[in-house]
């Protein structure tokens, strides 16, 4: 692989593309995240058995469809999410989604570090701040090696978390006296179904919007759709189930407390640590690509800086986790909606990244994101879905009208350059 093995400033060449199996493990390493188990615990204690599965399957199906669109575009073009955003937002306009997406990934990194350090501190009596510092440093170091390191870590962590989660579910069901007893559990504090759906989608809408950053390494765009669906519909659903079963059986929403109560302290520390490590490295990798789009600096250097920032802010982010998900569920989806909408309208432009003429700032795209956020906040229904559709539809309607002359001029120039 070349020195810039992150390919942060241009398309991934065919020589650096990877097979579907390697990408599937990388994406499962992303979605097999303990945060989904924590959210699953919240749903498991707040929803009935039937409503839990309905919320998880609907929410992750929506996530799978959304990320499949973005994965297809990423694999077809070989471009990062942030370079794709230049087509719709403009070269400097793309700095806004890069800042928003890159910043949230730094936040997720901090949440992940705390999710590992706090239960280990509870169980061992070691200082939590020291654990945060050490684990944050170790997780930051490996991201320097790029997509290859993510693949190796995922090959280890994905089977391990599947085994641990499956065993925890088996203990929970047996401890209750069978599946029928688990089905009969009535939530002490019921959770609104629309809120539950927003939590499911919000749990991975930020990382899901960055699907292109990982799947762009795929050799086949159609298979990239399969990779995204497996990772988000199947992988993320399993993580919710792993978290919910023990939570419902023991009445504890915190997965670390559940694992300790089930006598799984040591394997939980090792396996959940690996699990968080893979997702956190994915988060830092993606954040580096985002800030590289803004600064032009090496994405590897920026990933290390972001790791330090996320480590310092870890405890604050962990303590505001539900609020963080609520923010993400409305603020991030319109960005992906705009990228998808522009590709559907102008897909031929994406074939010539190096020569395509782009606006400096496309204010229509920024307005569409604002309208998408408003749709998510004010319209009834599922917040992230309203936000995606609001952003995409606003862009599809407004961009051809407000940028009619600019779009026509750019199309004319590009047609002549191709000829």
From Swiss-Prot:
Record-level GO cellular component terms: plasma membrane
Recorded coiled-coil stretches: none
Membrane topology, as annotated: Multi-pass membrane protein
Alphabetical UniProt keywords: Cell inner membrane, Cell membrane, Cytosine metabolism, Membrane, Transmembrane, Transmembrane helix, Transport
MF-aspect GO terms: cytosine transmembrane transporter activity
GO BP, sorted A to Z: cytosine metabolic process
Name the record gives this protein: Cytosine permease
Gene giving rise to this polypeptide: codB
């Amino acid at each position: 692989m070349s020195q810039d093995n992150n390919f942060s400033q241009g398309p991934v060449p065919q020589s650096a593309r990877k097979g579907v199996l390697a990408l599937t493990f990388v994406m499962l390493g992303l979605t097999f995240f303990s945060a989904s188990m924590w959210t699953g615990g919240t749903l498991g204690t707040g929803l009935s058995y039937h409503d839990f599965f309905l919320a998880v399957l609907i929410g992750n199906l929506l996530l799978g469809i959304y990320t499949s669109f973005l994965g297809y575009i990423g694999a077809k073009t070989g471009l990062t999410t942030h370079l794709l955003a230049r087509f719709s937002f403009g070269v400097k306009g793309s700095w806004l989604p890069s800042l928003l997406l890159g910043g949230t990934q730094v936040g997720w990194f901090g949440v992940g570090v705390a999710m590992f350090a706090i239960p280990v501190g509870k169980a061992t009596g070691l200082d939590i701040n020291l654990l945060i510092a050490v684990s944050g440093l170790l997780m930051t170091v490996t991201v320097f090696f790029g997509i290859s390191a993510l693949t190796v870590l995922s090959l280890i962590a994905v089977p391990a978390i599947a085994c641990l989660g499956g065993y925890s579910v088996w203990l929970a069901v047996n401890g209750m006296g069978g599946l029928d007893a688990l089905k009969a559990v009535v939530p002490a504090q019921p959770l609104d179904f629309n809120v539950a759906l927003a939590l499911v989608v919000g749990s991975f809408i930020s990382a899901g919007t960055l699907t292109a950053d990982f799947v762009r390494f795929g050799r086949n765009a159609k298979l990239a759709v399969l990779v995204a669906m497996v990772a988000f519909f199947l992988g993320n659903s399993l993580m919710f189930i792993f978290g919910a079963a023990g939570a419902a059986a023991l009445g504890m929403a915190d997965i670390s407390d559940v694992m300790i109560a089930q006598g799984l302290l040591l394997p939980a520390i090792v396996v959940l640590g690996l699990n968080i490590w893979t997702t956190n490295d994915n988060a830092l990798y993606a954040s580096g690509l985002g800030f590289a789009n803004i600064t032009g600096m090496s994405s590897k250097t920026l990933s290390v800086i972001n790791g330090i920032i996320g480590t310092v802010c870890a405890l604050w982010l962990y303590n505001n986790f539900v609020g963080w998900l609520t923010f993400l569920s409305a603020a991030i989806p319109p960005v992906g909606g705009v990228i998808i909408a522009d590709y559907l309208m102008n897909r031929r432009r994406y074939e010539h990244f190096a020569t395509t003429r782009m606006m400096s700032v496309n204010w229509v795209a920024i307005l569409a994101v604002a309208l998408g956020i408003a749709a998510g906040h004010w319209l009834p229904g599922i917040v992230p879905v309203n936000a995606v559709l609001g952003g995409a539809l606003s862009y599809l309607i407004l961009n051809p009208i407000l940028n009619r002359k600019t779009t026509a001029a750019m199309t004319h120039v590009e047609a002549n350059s191709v000829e």
